[in-house]
Amino acid sequence: MAALTRDPQFQKLQQWYREHRSELNLRRLFDANKDRFNHFSLTLNTNHGHILVDYSKNLVTEDVMRMLVDLAKSRGVEAARERMFNGEKINYTEGRAVLHVALRNRSNTPILVDGKDVMPEVNKVLDKMKSFCQRVRSGDWKGYTGKTITDVINIGIGGSDLGPLMVTEALKPYSSGGPRVWYVSNIDGTHIAKTLAQLNPESSLFIIASKTFTTQETITNAETAKEWFLQAAKDPSAVAKHFVALSTNTTKVKEFGIDPQNMFEFWDWVGGRYSLWSAIGLSIALHVGFDNFEQLLSGAHWMDQHFRTTPLEKNAPVLLALLGIWYINCFGCETHAMLPYDQYLHRFAAYFQQGDMESNGKYITKSGTRVDHQTGPIVWGEPGTNGQHAFYQLIHQGTKMIPCDFLIPVQTQHPIRKGLHHKILLANFLAQTEALMRGKSTEEARKELQAAGKSPEDLERLLPHKVFEGNRPTNSIVFTKLTPFMLGALVAMYEHKIFVQGIIWDINSFDQWGVELGKQLAKKIEPELDGSAQVTSHDASTNGLINFIKQQREARVQ
């Protein structure tokens, strides 16, 4: 594929941007077209609620959207989409298919990898998860002293942690009757020490989530958990009742003391950051029940079907991806804010930090050459309204343009005080996108200050500070209610957005070589931290840091 910057469709887009950028004023665009909302919004209707994607507050015209869709076609998005769904090995650096869509393929249509249908294996693992969840949640599964399981501790990192953690937080209202869940990821001993201090070994079940069962952070934490458990249980055979594995390495799992019957498998065509739909989601299913886990899968499958079959110009993941391309590759935007107005989604932005930045944080193309354009953005965000009192100042009046996605459910899980809290939340959600779009003109600010009774001197002094330029782009994503189905659909929508952008940039969204170098160096440095000898084998900075740490380790601190 030709480089993006040499694609005639991209060059056409860039030329339009250079010639017409100054005309893109959102106030004027809305004034000129009273039907703008209808032209630049989509409503996705499911049997489990509706999703409105309003992209009318973006710096686009119908010409721009047409050119963006033409660019997607020119870059081969439709063909690439089919290659993914057909099980082709689109993860070309690792020679793997990319089939998280198979994990939630509720239609159960055959999906082939190397000529073999993967669906029987997928369904077999789902059946095993269902049976296990029923045993634990019903109290049939007992610990070594005969107690039922009250706490499930997922030990994993990256994709084996972020997805299940985000989902179990998001679906807390659906957890009735399930065990509590805890997540330990960090190698920092504080994480596991603080967690274990709150648990009873007799009623705790540990899930060790590691494909290879060799991930340093995960296995170190798992060994610590086992040591803690055996201090109480004494008998190593009790491990089998309190530890299960999500892995593909039967030998290592057995060595650890876990019964292979309690090993839940997944496959090399499941990438870590796309794995919550697999056995990696066992903690989700235990917490909210397998029926709700299936609803999560069904919502994602609904979005998969929408993504696969809907024309590009009406395709929610495609449109979100193209708007991102417009801002990143024409406007030079470097970050993207995800702002969910729902406290249950407080880990949503953190989840997609990995989802987006590990997928598209690449500068090498499929042909092995360096890109000559920007790729993945820095993704960040916090729940509203907390963010309004923290960083929205920079979004409104800072010097950087930050495209934002605002998300909110129409119905709350907690309609306390006759829905007052949620009405205030909705009002803030609506006000922010309007404020970012409209801003406040000098004349409007002047009238406001006059009405407040400011003296002419104070008015002129304050006036420039009270002006908002506006013209800040946002998407508003409004959905009926945050249910398991709806969460599945939203997560899949963003997954496919990331995929489309990777295709347009001609990078591999499904490897993560950038994770490797630091891990390699850490293995070399770890033994150098032993003893008191000065270290000189690195650059001056790294040597200095190591030697300071060694010196201070023995220092007495009051």
Swiss-Prot record:
The modification N6-succinyllysine is found at residue 454. The modification Phosphothreonine is found at residues 109, 250. The modification N6-malonyllysine is found at residue 454. The modification N6-acetyllysine is found at residues 12, 142, 454. Disulfide bonds: none annotated. Changing residue 101 to M: In CNSHA4; GPI Sarcina. Changing residue 472 to C: In CNSHA4; Strongly reduced glucose-6-phosphate isomerase activity. Pfam families: PGI. The modification Phosphoserine is found at residues 107, 185, 455. Changing residue 224 to M: In CNSHA4; GPI Iwate. The active site is at 358 (proton donor), 389, 519. It catalyses: alpha-D-glucose 6-phosphate = beta-D-fructose 6-phosphate. Keywords: Acetylation, Cytokine, Cytoplasm, Disease variant, Gluconeogenesis, Glycolysis, Growth factor, Hereditary hemolytic anemia, Hydroxylation, Isomerase, Phosphoprotein, Secreted, Ubl conjugation. The modification N6-(2-hydroxyisobutyryl)lysine is found at residue 34. Homodimer; in the catalytically active form. Monomer in the secreted form. Belongs to the GPI family. It is linked to Anemia, congenital, non-spherocytic hemolytic, 4: An autosomal recessive form of anemia in which there is no abnormal hemoglobin or spherocytosis. It is caused by glucose phosphate isomerase deficiency. This is Glucose-6-phosphate isomerase. It comes from Homo sapiens.
